[in-house]
Amino acid sequence: MNENQRLLSVQNRTHLSVRQLAVFVLSLLMVGAMVLTNQRDNAVVESLVTPVPVMPVVSVDQRISTSWFCPGVPGNDGTISGSIIVSNPSDADFNATVTRLGVGVSPVVTAVTVAARSQAVVNVKEGIESPFISTIVEILGGVGTAEQFINHPAGNSVAQCANEPATDWYFADGFTGADSLDHIVLTNPYSDSTVVDVSFVTTESTREPSRLHGFVIPPRSVIALNMADEGARNEPVVAVEVHASAGKLVVGRSQHYLGDGRLGYTMALGASGLSSEWWFADGEKLDGSTEQLVILNPTRSDATLSVMFVNGANPDTQSEPASVIAPAGSVTLFDTGTLPNVPNGRYGIIVSTVGEPGVEAPGIVVEQVINRRVGNTVGTSVVLGAPMGAMSTVWVAPSGVSSGIDDAMLILNATPIEGTVTVSQIGPAGEVAIAGLESVLLPASGLVSIPVPAGISNGEIVVRATVPVVVQRMLLRGHELTGRSAVLALPTIPSPEVGS
């Protein structure tokens, strides 16, 4: 099948109208409630869709310790540095250990004390040499969070850290055009070997290299696969699936874009499962920007998708959702600019699979690629959407946000009910609302761009809303580069009641 055949089929109207958004959201909440009920009853249900968010979350449960598994930092280039930010929002100090892993080297362990209401920054590359270095953060107590930061000449990047290793990992997007560097970073944090099967999908075919079948990752080590060397050279899209047949692991993707419409650097954690819905808080139809949704359907059945664009406008003026066919075992490219009725400006995007009555909707993985052009240069951002079950009234950004810009955060209202949000920062006085952001109006089924004032010091950011929301950060890329890098904040799960 060629690239044109892989491109989606878009219809002008579909089964779901904007007027039905309330019913759509309520049905999702009912599904989540049923899943939780089944879990309590120990019911066993076979499904391709993981019933819990396939992304990192902040747990409200009391724990003796909390672990974070970070996806990796390039270690063999002196122009690139990396750090782990450990955040403590509580009123008491806590102790943590940061373990660095590489290939062919012994783990390096550092003990850290994080003072109350503050952060600690740990140099990833200190004391270890390896092509890629991954870290494990173990916190005594359940209140701390961690994120990874990479300072790269092609653009700085913040990556989420996983709550735990998993058997399956997915990336819908990947790019090796113009000899761009696409590394899949495999981290085995355990004392036993992990055995994986790695396959990838391009616009032309699905490939399962024999070298990557039964591929062994030694204990407590990190191995990076250069996808061009694995047979995916100069490909406009390289979707990757990693399955562990023995053990579990953490998988990240390091991308250095060198041309063919993309420039910059990103590092991201993969999706640890499939989801029947993906939410994006920063859709863009702006001068100089192009937007593409990259959809991986690794299942054996074709999937029908609904792609809804929401911006809080009058339902009578909202565009109808697009209907998309994602063929089985394929990657589908959806250029939102091809739809004439997509609203100008910024909007939220909801991608959901459509199941037959009485049949559970299949799972997919969706990433969003935005290229922002200013003059003769481009800045590329890639972000995985928020999966089913991730909507929450409380989100945290452990490493903070970029200040002095008018789009530091985009917040999408996941309900048809008007709400408000409060944006606070953790500091010496605890959690304190940022001036001007104490009560920001959030339109029903709409989104709001949050400007963070210049001069705000580094610190964990907390977003509290009166309705379930999705929160995405838009970060400066540093080095006087154009555009933004994008990463979600972390949802608190289960979603706290308003005022708790």
Q: Each PLM stretch: what is its role?
A:
Residues 172-185, 189-260, 269, 279:
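Solenoidal tandem-repeat scaffolds enriched in leucines and small polar residues
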Residues 42, 52-56, 85-127, 134-154, ...:
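Post-signal-peptide, soluble extracytosolic/periplasmic N-terminal scaffold domains
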Residues 20-83, 144-189, 248-298, 358-416, ...:
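Conserved functional hotspot residues at active sites or interaction interfaces
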Residues 83, 87-106, 185-208, 244, ...:
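Short acidic, flexible loop segments centered on an aromatic residue
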Residues 19-39, 96, 240-242, 305, ...:
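Hydrophobic alpha-helical membrane segments, chiefly transmembrane helices and signal peptide h-regions
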